Design a protein with these regions (language model features):
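Flexible loop residues that form catalytic
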Residues: 1, 21, 48, 112, ...
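Glycine-rich, proline-tolerant flexible connector loops at the mouths of alpha/beta enzymes
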Residues: 1-7, 144
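Active-site acidic/histidine proton-transfer and metal-coordination neighborhood
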Residues: 5, 12-15, 20-107, 116
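A general structural signal for stabilizing positions within well-ordered secondary structure
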Residues: 5-7, 34, 126, 162
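Short polybasic/polar patches that bind polyanions
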Residues: 7, 71, 164, 168
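Histidine-acidic metal/acid-base catalytic patches
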Residues: 39, 90, 96-109, 115-184
Length: 184
């Protein structure tokens, strides 16, 4: 039914945020079937705590099982970052570095969270361009305080220019509603 509605309005689903609970062995076939039914070729894991070595290892092990399984079905697996992946966890690991070095998962880079972690989002996009096909373009003033585009401190114009130059799709995400969320 969803596919018919998408077709009726000329829409496509570029990706879904599907947590690991939707990618366990007991529901994986159903998740794959759903994505095929709606014509969606991208599954993005939207968040994992990764608070210690055990959590990082378990996540990486699961990703390394899921990725080839999904690829056989024509589905690409991605991970959506936040700022905590760029900071040492309770065991001193930097989860983003572990993900990059121990998997080949694609990245859906939330450029604001890279900025909020005191990293350069433009440099990150350039350095990992072969693993990034889509970004979240978002603004904020640091920490967990988002703003409407152009009202924060993140380098959104430079990020946008870089993403265009590198052929990356952009999801424009607003954490603020100034002036109304629709007008921005």
């Amino acid at each position: 039914q969803i596919k018919a509605w998408l077709d009726q309005y000329g829409l496509r689903v570029s990706g879904t945020h599907t947590g690991l609970a939707g990618l366990t062995d007991d529901v994986l076939e159903e998740t794959i079937a759903y994505h095929k039914a709606i014509g969606c070729e991208n599954i993005i894991i939207p968040f994992e705590k990764l608070e210690n070595k055990a959590a990082v290892d378990a996540f990486i092990d699961r990703v390394n099982v899921l990725q080839p399984r999904l690829a056989k079905e024509g589905i690409t697996l991605h991970y959506h970052n936040h700022d905590h992946e760029f900071k040492p966890n309770e065991d001193g690991l930097i989860p983003e570095e572990e993900i990059l070095s121990r998997t080949s998962i694609n990245l859906e880079v939330d450029t604001y969270w890279v900025f909020a972690a005191d990293k350069d989002p433009v440099a990150f996009l350039k350095e990992h361009k072969d693993r990034i096909s889509v970004i979240h373009l978002k603004d904020g003033i640091g920490g967990h305080e988002g703003k409407s585009l152009g009202l924060g401190k993140a380098p959104v114009l430079q990020v946008r220019e870089t993403a265009i130059a590198l052929g990356m799709e952009m999801v424009v995400e607003s954490e603020g509603l100034e002036p109304t969320g629709l007008e921005e």
